[in-house]
Amino acid sequence: MKEFIIKANKAVTNGEINLKDLPGSSGRLDLLCRCVNSAFFLSHDMRRDTIFYSVNYGSPNPPVALKFVGSELKRVSPDERSIALFIKKALEKDASELWKESTSGIYSSKREFRDIILEKKNEGKRIFYLHLNGKPLEDFEFKNQDDEDFLFVLGDHIGIGDEDEEFLEEIGAEKISLSPLELHADHCIILVHNILDRLK
């Protein structure tokens, strides 16, 4: 199982989303939509072995975590507007500590970025922090996905911040670099999928 989590520093935390202004008034929700696209959509299929989390820290009521489960997703199209509509529905729910399903395979909860990562760590998942200054990808050995589960941690255009970087170091997350160049989060997801696809 492959799981991804992004800290969305400015992404809105209620359903008041302007679909005509995802990058601006919605707090770079366009970035989040592109990550969902990269996490799940193939040319004529969807990835069922993937879960994607976004933890939104924008106004008015942060944090709100969103969870997308590939094996359950239905009716979502790959374009940003369609994905944003489903995110809007999820954010219209009153978030609590329990995951609430808004539409098939999409959930919201009142959870912190670190809490989800710790939960995955306690489940035995191997945690990777994708960062420009991490160890080169070729220095890591990945087992077959049937033998090992992964969580990949991503930052948005702002990053995750020093405190969360220290937290990841404390829990033993492995810092990995996919490229000598700084990449967009959605591009990183595609590269990770490509690497793990080749292990099947």
Curated annotation (Swiss-Prot):
Listed GO biological process terms: tRNA methylation
Cited CDD domains: TrmY-like (cd18087)
Keywords: Cytoplasm, Methyltransferase, S-adenosyl-L-methionine, Transferase, tRNA processing
Catalyses which reaction(s): pseudouridine(54) in tRNA + S-adenosyl-L-methionine = N(1)-methylpseudouridine(54) in tRNA + S-adenosyl-L-homocysteine + H(+)
EC annotation from Swiss-Prot or TrEMBL: 2.1.1.257
One cellular component (GO) term of this entry: cytoplasm
Compartments where located: Cytoplasm
Gene3D superfamilies for the chain: 3.40.1280.10
UniProt-recorded Gene Ontology molecular function terms: S-adenosylmethionine-dependent methyltransferase activity; tRNA methyltransferase activity
Residue numbers binding S-adenosyl-L-methionine: 130, 155, 178-183, 188
Stored InterPro entries: Alpha/beta_knot_MTases, TrmY, tRNA_m1G_MTases_N
Keyword Cytoplasm: yes
Top-level taxon of origin: Archaea
Main location as per UniProt: cytoplasm
Function: Specifically catalyzes the N1-methylation of pseudouridine at position 54 (Psi54) in tRNAs.
Family: Belongs to the methyltransferase superfamily. TrmY family.
Assembly description: Homodimer.
Protein's name according to its UniProt entry: tRNA (pseudouridine(54)-N(1))-methyltransferase
Organism whose genome encodes this protein: Methanococcus maripaludis (strain DSM 14266 / JCM 13030 / NBRC 101832 / S2 / LL)
